[in-house]
Every structure is written in structure tokens, then in C-alpha cells.
């Protein structure tokens, strides 16, 4: 898990993560002015039953992930100028990620619209904290890529599922910059199940395709990463939308939600991301 003190691969990297209890609703900041990034219309995938819309934070945290539903989306058009917040944060001193807290954000010299954006992000962060979750709010300038991936790339740009040892969900919201992307389970193939990839993994492992090999795949998180099927159409999580997605945990009633960090390019704006 990321902390304010050190940079590790973000939770979107598919690491085995532990989450705590649920969260309760809190009023949002009144609507004022939209950031330019929030002017782009957002549409959930049509006729995809695994995603369910909710209309409040209380519904986001209390609606069960069952009957095939593995993602909840609270669509929101947020007020505030998030681009101004990113500009005020600066270039990040060459680091790929800047951890944000109330003191740092409230010390920024921004307009009233920038202040609205700051208070919105902190309000969302507090919603999660109020329910004993461990959210992190970051300005992300770039993700490190897996330069020595071997047969399976395990960086944040690979489609993957989050994992936990017990029932848990991942909560996330992108406020600025490219947003997270999802992949329909029906269009996802576990990379370890692709014959050529599995054969190469077995060569790296140097043993038989048995229970010990399954442990090897699990320990390296290879079993959490997915390849899009031919013709797959990933979908955007959009900006300002608050998501709750299913993780891979023992006896889960639904498959995990497959997702990834956006494949950012040079010149793309930094991301403001809340995740728990």
C-alpha cells in the first residue's frame, strides 16, 4: 500500500491488498464551475450487466456485489477547477508520484474554483477514512514500467484484478487527467491460461504444471493479469465518478473487475487519483 513517506507501485498494479470496513455518506461541495476535463460526456458500457449505477455514496458502499455485478459507479459532475490544482502542485520534482494531504492541498494558492476542487477531494477522502479504510490521494506524473517483465507484464498498464485474502472492494475516483480503464470479463483472458504464455512461464519456473506451479504464479501475481480478447472494447471509468469494484478473494460470489491504469503518453496531464 502506498504511504505518504515512500513510493511503491500504486494499488492499480494488481498487488495483493487488504481493505477495511465500509464508509458512510457525507454531503458534497455545492456545484460551482467545472474543470475542462469534466465537460466530456461520460457513458457506461451499454447492456453490460456487471456494472450497476448508484445515486449516492451510501448506495455505493451498501449495495452488495452479487448476481454477477462486480462494479458500482456513482456518476458525478463535480464542481471545481482540478487543472488549476495540478498546475499549483507543480512538476513533482522529478518524482513519479506526489502524495497529497489536507495541509499540502490547502496551502496552495488557487482561485475559488480551485478551492472547491480541493475540498471535494478531501471530502471524498474523509468519506473513506470515516469507515476505517485507508485511502490515498495522489498526483501521478507517470508510472514506472515493468522493464524486466518476463512472460507476463505486471505493471499498472496491464489489465489486472486486485486481490485480498478476505472480502474486500477497491474504491477509486480520477479527478483529472486520463482515467482508469475497465475490461469486460467476457472479453478478458487470464494470461497464465494462454498456452504460449503458460509454456514460457513453465520454462522460467523449471518444474511441472502442478500445485507448486500455481503457488509460483500466485506469488508473482501472474495469475492476476489479463489479455484483451480479439475485438475487445475497454471502457473508461471517466472523471469525477466514484467507483467500487470487486477484488479477487476466496469464495467471492462474482468475478473480479478487470481494470488498468491508462496507457499514458508523453505530454498527457498528471492524474489526480483517490484510491483505497
Regions found by a protein language model. Give the residues of each.
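N-terminal auxiliary "cap/dimerization" subdomain that precedes the catalytic jelly-roll/cupin core
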Residues: 16, 30-132
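Short, surface-exposed beta-edge/turn micro-motifs
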Residues: 68-71, 168-171, 240, 270-271
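Catalytic core of non-heme Fe(II) oxygenases with the double-stranded beta-helix
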Residues: 153-232, 238
Amino acid at each position: 500500500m502506498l504511504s505518504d513517506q515512500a513510493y511503491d507501485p500504486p494499488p492499480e498494479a494488481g498487488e495483493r491488498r487488504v481493505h477495511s470496513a465500509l464508509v458512510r455518506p457525507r454531503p458534497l461541495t455545492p456545484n460551482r464551475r467545472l474543470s475542462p476535463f469534466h465537460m466530456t460526456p461520460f457513458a457506461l458500457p451499454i447492456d453490460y450487466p456487471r456494472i450497476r449505477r448508484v445515486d449516492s455514496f451510501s448506495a455505493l458502499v451498501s449495495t452488495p456485489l452479487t448476481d454477477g455485478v462486480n462494479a458500482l459507479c456513482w456518476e458525478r459532475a463535480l464542481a471545481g477547477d482540478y487543472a488549476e490544482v495540478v498546475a499549483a502542485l507543480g512538476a513533482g520534482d522529478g518524482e513519479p508520484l506526489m502524495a497529497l494531504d489536507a495541509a499540502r492541498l490547502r496551502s496552495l494558492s488557487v482561485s475559488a474554483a480551485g478551492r472547491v476542487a480541493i475540498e471535494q477531494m478531501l471530502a471524498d477522502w474523509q468519506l473513506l477514512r470515516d469507515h476505517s479504510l485507508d485511502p490515498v490521494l495522489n498526483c501521478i506524473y507517470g508510472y514506472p514500467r515493468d522493464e524486466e517483465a518476463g512472460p507476463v507484464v505486471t505493471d499498472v498498464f496491464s489489465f489486472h484484478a486486485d486481490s485480498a485474502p478476505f472480502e474486500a472492494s477497491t474504491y477509486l475516483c480520477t479527478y483529472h487527467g486520463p482515467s482508469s480503464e475497465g475490461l469486460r470479463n467476457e472479453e478478458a483472458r487470464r494470461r497464465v491460461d494462454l498456452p504460449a504464455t503458460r509454456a514460457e512461464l513453465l520454462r522460467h519456473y523449471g518444474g511441472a504444471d502442478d500445485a507448486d506451479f500455481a503457488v509460483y504464479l500466485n506469488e508473482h501475481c501472474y495469475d492476476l493479469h489479463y489479455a484483451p480478447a480479439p475485438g475487445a472494447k475497454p471502457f473508461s471509468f471517466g472523471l469525477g465518478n466514484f467507483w467500487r469494484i470487486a477484488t479477487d478473494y476466496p469464495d467471492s460470489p462474482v468475478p473480479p473487475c478487470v481494470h488498468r491504469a491508462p496507457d499514458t503518453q508523453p505530454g498527457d496531464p498528471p492524474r489526480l487519483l483517490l484510491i483505497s
